[in-house]
C-alpha cells in the first residue's frame, strides 16, 4: 500500500496533499475551517445536483417546482433545506476562515490570500444567483435591486444591466441564465480551490505563533485528519440541528410569496450573509459611491499585506492590534444588524458610523497600532 501511495502518479498527489504533508505541530482548531469549507462545497454540489433534477428555470413554473420538490419528491424538503442552510453554514465557515487569516497574518502568503479573495467573490456570486432561483418575492426584488446597481457605471451602465437581464426587466431570460451560472460556478469554485491549495502547499501552513515552523513539522495524517474529522462531526451536528429544527430561521418569509413585479415588499434585503456589505452600500447616499464602497468592502482584503506594519506576523503577542481586531468583528456584527433594518433614523446614522469605522480600522488604526507596538517593544 505504501508503494502505491508514494509511486502511483495520481495517488501520490493526494498523498503529498493530505497524508504525508508536513504540517506545523501547533495549529489550533482555527485551522479546521479549510476542510469544513471543502465539506460544505461537497454538500452544496450534491444537494444542488438533486434539486436541479426537479427544478424548472421558467418564471411560470419555478416557484411551483420548488413547492413540488418540498411536497412530492422523496426527502425533497430535506434536500431543499440542506441546500438553503448549507449556504449559511458555508458563509459562517468562510467568515471564520477569513477572520483567522487576518488574525494570524496569513495574508502574507499573498498568492494563497488573493486566490481566497477570488473564491470569496465566486461564492458570493453563486449564492446571490441561487437566491433568485425559487422566484419568490425577495428573489425577484433582490435580483432587480442588486443587478440595477450596475447601472451606476458611467456610460455603459444601463446597457450592461439590460444585457445581464436579457431584456428590459428581470424576467424569464434572467432566471434561465442565473440557473445556468448557478449550476456551473460551483465546479469553477472547485477548480479554484485546488489552485488555492496548490499555492498553500508551496509555502506551507501558517501557525498561531506566526513564526517559521520548518524545524517542527508533523505528518498531516493521522494527526490532523482525526482533528478535522472532529470538526466535521461538530459542523454536521450544528447543520442537522439547523436544518431539521429551524429550517426557516435564516430565510425571509417574503420568499414564500410568488414573485410579483407589481407589488414591492416593504423591506428589500438580501440573505443575512450579505447584510454587512448591503449596509455599507446603503450608508452612502450616492449610487455610484455606494457601489464602489460595496466592492471595496471585500477588495480591501487584497490590500492587507500592504497595510501590515508590524514586525510580527500574527496578533498573538500584540494586544493593541488585537483590540482593534475585535472592535472590527463587533463592527461587522453591527453592520449585519443594520443591513436588515429599514432606512430610517437612527439606523441610517448607525450604518454610516459603522461603515466609516470598518474602513478606518483596517486602513488607519490597525497599521498605526502595528507601528506603535514596534516602538514600545523596540523592534525597529
Curated annotation (Swiss-Prot):
Q: What is the effect of changing residue 118 to I?
A: In strain: Isolate 1
Tell me the compartments it is located in. Answer: Mitochondrion inner membrane
What cofactor is needed?
heme b
The protein here is known as Cytochrome b
Q: Does the keyword NADP apply?
A: no
**Which SUPFAM superfamilies is this protein grouped with?**
a domain/subunit of cytochrome bc1 complex (Ubiquinol-cytochrome c reductase), Transmembrane di-heme cytochromes
Gene Ontology terms: biological process:
mitochondrial electron transport, ubiquinol to cytochrome c
Give the species.
Microtus guentheri (Gunther's vole)
Q: What is stated as this protein's family in its record? A: Belongs to the cytochrome b family.
Q: Which gene encodes it?
A: MT-CYB
| Function, as annotated | Component of the ubiquinol-cytochrome c reductase complex (complex III or cytochrome b-c1 complex) that is part of the mitochondrial respiratory chain. The b-c1 complex mediates electron transfer from ubiquinol to cytochrome c. Contributes to the generation of a proton gradient across the mitochondrial membrane that is then used for ATP synthesis.
The record's principal subcellular location, in a coarse class, is mitochondrion
Q: How does it sit in the membrane?
A: Multi-pass membrane protein
Query: How does the cofactor bind to this protein, according to its record?
Result: Binds 2 heme b groups non-covalently.
Amino acid at each position: 500500500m505504501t508503494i502505491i501511495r508514494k509511486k502511483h502518479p495520481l495517488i501520490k498527489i493526494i498523498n503529498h496533499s493530505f497524508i504525508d504533508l508536513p504540517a506545523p505541530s501547533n495549529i489550533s482548531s482555527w485551522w479546521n475551517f479549510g476542510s469544513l469549507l471543502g465539506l460544505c462545497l461537497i454538500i452544496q454540489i450534491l444537494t444542488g445536483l438533486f434539486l436541479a433534477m426537479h427544478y424548472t428555470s421558467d418564471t411560470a413554473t419555478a416557484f411551483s417546482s420548488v413547492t413540488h420538490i418540498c411536497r412530492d419528491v422523496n426527502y425533497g424538503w430535506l434536500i431543499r433545506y440542506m441546500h438553503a442552510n448549507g449556504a449559511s453554514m458555508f458563509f459562517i465557515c468562510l467568515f471564520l476562515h477569513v477572520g483567522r487569516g487576518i488574525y494570524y497574518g496569513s495574508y502574507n502568503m499573498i498568492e494563497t490570500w488573493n486566490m481566497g479573495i477570488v473564491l470569496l467573490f465566486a461564492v458570493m456570486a453563486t449564492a446571490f444567483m441561487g437566491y433568485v432561483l425559487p422566484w419568490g418575492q425577495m428573489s425577484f426584488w433582490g435580483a432587480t435591486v442588486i443587478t440595477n446597481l450596475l447601472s451606476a457605471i458611467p456610460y455603459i451602465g444601463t446597457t450592461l444591466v439590460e444585457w445581464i437581464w436579457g431584456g428590459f426587466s428581470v424576467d424569464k431570460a434572467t432566471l434561465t441564465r442565473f440557473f445556468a451560472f448557478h449550476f456551473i460556478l460551483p465546479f469553477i469554485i472547485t477548480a479554484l480551490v485546488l489552485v488555492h491549495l496548490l499555492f498553500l502547499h508551496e509555502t506551507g501552513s501558517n501557525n498561531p505563533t506566526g513564526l517559521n515552523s520548518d524545524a517542527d513539522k508533523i505528518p498531516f495524517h493521522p494527526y490532523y485528519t482525526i482533528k478535522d474529522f472532529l470538526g466535521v462531526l461538530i459542523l454536521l451536528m450544528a447543520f442537522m440541528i439547523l436544518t431539521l429544527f429551524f429550517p426557516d430561521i435564516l430565510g425571509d418569509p417574503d420568499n414564500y410569496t410568488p414573485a410579483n413585479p407589481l407589488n414591492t415588499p416593504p423591506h428589500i434585503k438580501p440573505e443575512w450573509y450579505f447584510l454587512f456589505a448591503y449596509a455599507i452600500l446603503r450608508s452612502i447616499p450616492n449610487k455610484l459611491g455606494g457601489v464602489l464602497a460595496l466592492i471595496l468592502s471585500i477588495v480591501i482584503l487584497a490590500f492587507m499585506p500592504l497595510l501590515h506594519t508590524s514586525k510580527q506576523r500574527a496578533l498573538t503577542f500584540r494586544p493593541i492590534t488585537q483590540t482593534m481586531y475585535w472592535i472590527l468583528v463587533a463592527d461587522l456584527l453591527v453592520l449585519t444588524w443594520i443591513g436588515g433594518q429599514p432606512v430610517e433614523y437612527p439606523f441610517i446614522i448607525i450604518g454610516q458610523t459603522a461603515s466609516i469605522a470598518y474602513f478606518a480600522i483596517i486602513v488607519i488604526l490597525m497599521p498605526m497600532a502595528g507601528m506603535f507596538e514596534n516602538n514600545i517593544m523596540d523592534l525597529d
